[in-house]
UniProtKB/Swiss-Prot annotation:
Domain Helicase C-terminal: 237-398
Catalytic activity: ATP + H2O = ADP + phosphate + H(+)
The protein's name: ATP-dependent RNA helicase FAL1
Similarity comment text for this entry: Belongs to the DEAD box helicase family. DDX48/FAL1 subfamily.
Stretches assigned to the Helicase ATP-binding domain: 54-226
Species name: Eremothecium gossypii (strain ATCC 10895 / CBS 109.51 / FGSC 9923 / NRRL Y-1056) (Yeast)
Gene Ontology CC terms, in alphabetical order: catalytic step 2 spliceosome; FAL1-SGD1 complex; nucleolus; preribosome, small subunit precursor; small-subunit processome
Domain notes: The Q motif is unique to and characteristic of the DEAD box family of RNA helicases and controls ATP binding and hydrolysis.
CDD domains xref list: SF2_C_DEAD
A molecular-function term among this protein's GO annotations: ATP binding
Role this protein plays: ATP-dependent RNA helicase involved in 40S ribosomal subunit biogenesis. Required for the processing and cleavage of 35S pre-rRNA at sites A0, A1, and A2, leading to mature 18S rRNA.
Gene Ontology BP term (one): mRNA splicing, via spliceosome
EC assignment: 3.6.4.13
One Pfam family cited in the UniProt record for this chain: DEAD
Amino acid sequence: MSFDRNQDGKLKVKTSSKLPVSPTFESMKLQENLLRGIYGYGFEAPSAIQSRAITQIIRGKDVIAQAQSGTGKTATFTIGMLQVIDSSSKDLQALVLSPTRELAAQISQVVRNLGDYMNVVALACTGGKALQQDISKVNKGCHVMSGTPGRVLDMIKRRIINTRHVKMLVLDEADELLSETLGFKQQLYDIFTKLPSSVQVVVVSATMSKDVLEVTKKFMSDPVKILVKRDEVSLEGIKQYHINVDKEEWKFDTLCDLYDSLTITQCVIFCNTKKKVDWLSHKLIQNNFAVASIHGDMKQDDRDKVMSDFRSGSSRVLISTDVWARGIDVQQVSLVINYDLPELLENYIHRIGRSGRFGRKGVAINFITREEVTKLKSIEKHYSIKIKPMPADIDSLS
């Protein structure tokens, strides 16, 4: 895994106080086996957010860390967490909560990869699969649990997991976790009441709304804030275009035309509803296009299979709702198509960031009906960007 060092260096980092910056992982005084895992994972030097946040996490400070999608946020809290975990004990010591099952699974894998030489056990505990599977794994010992709030709270209430020794709680994609729409907020409150009062809290997100900052005041003690202001969140590596289609029903033909014209490695197509995802994937398959689809109503085994096939490259076009937009890193994605513009302005960066992970170049194409012109202008204003009309010379995009 790598990121564009020049791109990362352009990010302006704002902190609540003058924090020390660690130019190398060695300067953080990390355990030797953790350094082996970091370099084995492909990191060479810390990113802007890593160079500031990791040492604060290790010191035991509560931390609010905001960085753009693809700058190494997951590795930031994972490295800090692994440094302070006592692997000689079988106790659960760190809890990571995420808004989606896929993200929770990915985080547990990152913990295992970075902690490869440390004998650290990390489990993903999410809904959609038999509880008994998680119980048998937890009983063998678990240092880090990465899960969704509902499943984790259920396991705490059933006394399947013991939280007495949890010293760190991480809220990943906190803006989503703490939003009213997903209904996780009360579950998070309930989980907090089951943790030791001394628990260290780390909040990580690509966007940080005022509501999130207010909610974190309830749970955090004098947190260190490391923030990238919204208008400094870089979309520089991603070419963004729009295609005017006038009517909704014309979007499908436009998409088919793009398939014939664009040479793509892998592509993600976003729709706003599960029904639209099912409809579009069915219609494309009817027209002999090979596509896969994923959304929250699918069985967990089916979702895992879709993600596995897409990661391996055996499927190259994925149609999805916003469930896939946050945090999932598939490095080969070079094109994102917004079949529908996102309902929430904040989700625009999560969606199109799929095509420009870690500073890689990508293309984002937005289908715009007459009714969506106003929404497009709102996105441009929100991110201080200009989304250009699609050029006639499509070959120039690649």
